[in-house]
Regions:
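A beta-strand edge to alpha-helix "cap/lid" segment located at domain peripheries
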Residues: 2-10, 14-17, 23-24, 41, ...
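Conserved short acidic donor-positioning loop in nucleotide-sugar-dependent glycosyltransferases
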Residues: 22-25, 46
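Short, well-ordered alpha-helical segments enriched in acidic and aromatic residues
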Residues: 24-41
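Short beta-edge strand/loop motif at the mouth of beta-sheet-based domains
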Residues: 37, 46-56
């Protein structure tokens, strides 16, 4: 039933709907929107193969649901690109802040591949030269 519904939705809508599950801490709900063989490439860091590795990643890094601030979303064919900011609570209970650019590839209405560029924000921004 969910598959028929997904095929009628735009990929950008599917992604934002899936991310609502992440925001609520329902990671299994999110994973229902991914293909079984989903691949996540975190540029310069790691590659996750399949839902089991993604599930383990979420268990390790999402101590509580991450907080997203989506800046832009662009859909082109089977791809959706999203930029924004994300906050993750670390094991010490403090938030780590990141900028991100995610490029998602869809197959049959499900998220099949992610290429993520994630950059940690450190310290204060440099003072203005004006």
């Amino acid at each position: 039933m969910i598959q028929n519904k997904l095929l009628k939705m735009k990929n950008i809508t599917i992604l934002h709907t899936a991310n609502e599950f992440i925001a609520k801490g329902d990671y299994e709900g999110f994973l229902a929107y991914c293909t079984a063989e989903t691949k996540w490439f975190f540029v310069g860091e790691r590659i996750l193969h399949g839902k089991e590795e993604v599930r383990a990643y979420m268990k390790e890094f999402y101590q509580e649901p991450p907080v997203f601030n989506v800046e832009k979303s662009i859909e082109e064919g089977d791809f959706v690109m999203v930029t924004g900011e994300i906050r993750l609570r670390n094991k010490e209970g403090k938030y780590d802040h990141f900028d991100y650019c995610d490029i998602w590839r869809f197959e049959d209405g499900k998220m099949a591949e992610l290429k993520a560029f994630v950059i940690e924000k450190r310290g204060s921004p440099p003072p203005s030269s004006e």
